[in-house]
Amino acid sequence: MSPPHSEHSNVPSDVAAGGGPKKSPPAGTQKLRAPRMRASCDGCFLAKVKCSKGKPMCQRCMTTGLACKYSPSSRSGKPKASDNGNILNGAPRHAKREGLQFSSPVFEGSQDLMAGPAQFMQNNWGSNQQAMWDLPTHQDPGTNFGSGPLNESLGQDIGIMDGISHDGGVMPFSENLADTNPWQSQNPSSSFSQMLPGSSGSMIHGRSQSTDMMISLVAANFQDTNAQAGPSHGPPLGQMAGPSHGPLGQMAVPLHGPPLGQMAGLSHGPLGQMTSPPNPAHARHHSDPAIGTGHVLSCNFDCTHQSLQRLNFMLATSSWPSDMLMTANENLCDAWRVIMRCPNCMGSGARRYMALAFLATSMQIQSRRLQAFLDTVKPNHDGVFPTVSNPAEKLNRLGTAITQIDQAYALLLRSFNNEMIEHPGVAQALANGVHKSLDAAVSLLLRKRTELAGTN
């Protein structure tokens, strides 16, 4: 008779029960656990406020009008260990963490707002201190217009920028502006926080390099500030800066224009498919005369967001017919006027940096399209222009569009300089370089138009 089974026996219970030892599934067949969703929505998480955790929309997002989205948590937890002692099918834990994808932008349906040809935005966040300027810069009117890109150099005498890559249209900053360059570090949160007086590094989501995520966070913080401080009052933006004159002494682009509801031209043409319906409060803020010019309602950052959507589409477009190019130039100026007229979108340093990026990138578009257009108006060996009808008139219209953007940019720099009292030299250097470059570009256009008129 066998002795009874002792509780201190070394025999496993499953073996004692007669079932035999349990076999683990072979390595590589174990299923990974589904990612755990974050308890708070993206907007509340980035703003560091308590979320009501409502589905499909929390109370705060419902009140502010922001998109409510729940993303996977960045804390993956401890994975289940396999039989061989390694985790996650034998791969080191740090190797798996490197492949994790973090939360997507709050604003759905928009790509990285500054994405473009050669993915220059991704290339610009590195330590090479590259920015997004790509401007027509020949200083000598006698330079051969068709011998290369329009932007060989920009204001080298003032040391603002040192060079440009001809394929991607990316221009690096010079070393003397390295300490004040807002695009100088790998992490955009540190560079933006260093440039803004009184701001903290927690303002920008440190793990995300998405401009869309940064805009979402700035908008969320702005909503919280408005809720605590109440409606703000102040003079309209059109009275903040005086009249602006371009390098050729022409009349400035007026700040005052039709309200947003009447700007139907922005929803047509090559950029129409990128528009989104405006927020009702945003449209009322721009169009209701009963509110008054000094009373500011929250526009939920729609002015800058929608304008940057159009800009993103323009950067992603490889080529346009010349007539569509003219329409795009007009839409650029119209979209910029919307941002400039909105005190909410231009009411803080972070928004002014976004507006500065908008204008710089629009100038990049202008320069690249202009160079491509000039390549099409070169005469063949018989002196005939086979691809473009009436090239002198189209060159004239291009010159007008460049001057308009230059004037709007000068207006931005005036207000930008008022904001950045600690670094006034940066805005002044930008103004000098941009004015000098665009002045030379328009002069070359006029000379080219004269040459075309003489050959026809």
Swiss-Prot record:
The keyword Cell membrane does not apply. The keyword S-adenosyl-L-methionine does not apply. Transcription factor that positively regulates the expression of the gene cluster that mediates the biosynthesis of dihydroxynaphthalene (DHN)-melanin, a bluish-green pigment forming a dark layer in the conidial wall that protects the conidia from UV radiations. PfmaF assists PfmaH in promoting melanin synthesis. PfmaF may function as a broad regulator promoting also other secondary metabolism as well as fungal development. One of its GO terms (cellular component) is nucleus. Residues 41-68 bind DNA. It is found in: Nucleus. This is Transcription factor PfmaF. Disruption phenotype: Does not affect the production of scytalone. Gene3D superfamilies: Zn(2)-C6 fungal-type DNA-binding domain. InterPro entries: OAF3, Zn2-C6_fun-type_DNA-bd_sf, Zn2Cys6_DnaBD. One of its GO terms (molecular function) is DNA binding. It comes from Pestalotiopsis fici (strain W106-1 / CGMCC3.15140). SMART domains: GAL4. One of its GO terms (biological process) is melanin biosynthetic process. Residues 1-34, 181-206 are annotated as: Disordered. Coiled coil: none annotated. The gene is PfmaF. Keywords: DNA-binding, Melanin biosynthesis, Metal-binding, Nucleus, Transcription, Transcription regulation, Zinc.
